[in-house]
Amino acid sequence: VNRAAFLDSGIFIAVLSRRDRLHAQAVELFGRAETPWVTSLLVISESCSWFLHRHGEEAARNLRAFISALTGLTILGVTLDDHKRTLRVLDRFRGAKLTYVDAASLGWIELRKINTVWSTDHHLGLTGAEIL
């Protein structure tokens, strides 16, 4: 069992958006120094796009700075094998309206046996991981 927490775009939005209803909880979660984190380039891309299009370039730059400052963060690249696994996840959960990024994340969560996901998206619990 992997003790790392998988970070989804929702947790980045919550921690950096003071008006977000989960902001205080997200700040508390990131205050847990003992937690190793995992996310993917797909999640980072999705998060950067969200901040850029909703709050502008400076907000997207702030996200990039926040992510760069996370010591102990593992960022997963994307391979053709990851793409194939993502397609299998999309087929497996057909009807759940999963985005490609969420399906890729579910694939990595299962592959790496990650039991904890920091997210605001219930879809990332489809494989049994706990959503915080």
Q: What are the residue ranges of the model-derived segments?
A:
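A generic structural signal for short hydrophobic patches within well-formed alpha-helices
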Residues: 12, 44, 124-125
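Active-site phosphate/pyrophosphate-handling residues
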Residues: 10, 42, 104-107
